[in-house]
């Protein structure tokens, strides 16, 4: 059986970030990816001169500290991460309104009535008072507790309009959420961390997979290695060889679909929570199961429309994206004009538009043939971007059954206990760990997972030394508890 120091399962940005930080700390890693490329939900593809971002679309200039740390570490120049100059628009009452979520929208309206704008102002004031001191890395501590978006906005006509014309369109378009199923705390935490929906958004000039590709170039990554089970094993005996971190060999068994196995001293599962549940099976500790089970996902389904010409912004003030409220459509939740998002997304004189299926139809359409998905979603999108179908020369459907963390109320309730759990041989990474549905959430979780791996190894080594000196297990237990406390305390610093 092949033996490795730390096995990282999943070569999305969370797994690659974890591997990067572990290597920087002196550990040896091997990354196993079931697919044929790295990036996960940050994957991009190149088709006949078009550059398609299949999953994630943007990063932010503020609130993405962990991402920018990696960008600098791998040597991506800031000039290769341009600012997206156009903004977001809202489709309402038969037309697109610019400045959705941007302070300018208070003046222009952004599709809101005066009552809705007043509710927006009161919401901003509430964030500055009742939410003051709130740590976006700890959404479970929010004043809203586990209230859903719908519950949070109940009680007044103004708040209900704020939901209908801002919070619901943004959450459905960006996260694939339904307001009655997702908690408001993770959304507010995400927006507060970057400075609001009108933040300074950016993208990678060479595709959203840029950072993942650069990281993978520096790491041992094995593609086409689908993992089917991850099991903790009893550690080696007194005569076994401790690894670089002091953890004895044989700690984790990784089983692959082709029947092969790898033994690792420690492991990081950088996969969505539902998949982590499957991989751990009955081996999953009771203290981890509640949060993993509560960390449900929403599917994401979008159609890339390759155009024979660039369609113009739907608003006079340039907008590269249009969010569509549920009240206007339960089929199409939004569009992105990628040729306005960044240069190079389409060949000269051509265009590219991404059409997002709404969370009300995505589950139904996910398993349907491409032709039905395109016909259903793009026919509806024509209402919001006239000329789309006539300009389309080719379509590609991108499906993510496990699209983004749902931010369910149960996950908000269970997260504190999950963070306080002891470190173990198997740790986790993914934006679900941070309860922050974004690439920054994934990167931060990778850094946290690396810290917990190192803390566990340090605790095991200290416990072994203390146990040998004292002849008791109490010292080992104390060292492990200290390692867990240190790792949990690091959440707010990643």
Briefly describe each language-model feature range:
Residues 4-31:
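N-terminal Rossmann-like FAD-binding beta1-loop-alpha1 element of flavoenzymes
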Residues 100-102, 317, 334-494:
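Conserved flavin/dinucleotide-binding core of flavoenzymes
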Residues 125-229, 235-237:
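Active-site/ligand-binding neighborhood in enzyme catalytic cores
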Residues 48-140:
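Dinucleotide-binding Rossmann-like beta1-alpha1 core, especially the glycine-rich loop
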Residues 228-353, 359-366, 384, 469, ...:
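Mid-domain catalytic core of redox enzymes
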Residues 14, 37, 274:
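Conserved Rossmann-like nucleotide-cofactor binding loop
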Residues 23-47:
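Glycine-rich FAD pyrophosphate-binding loop
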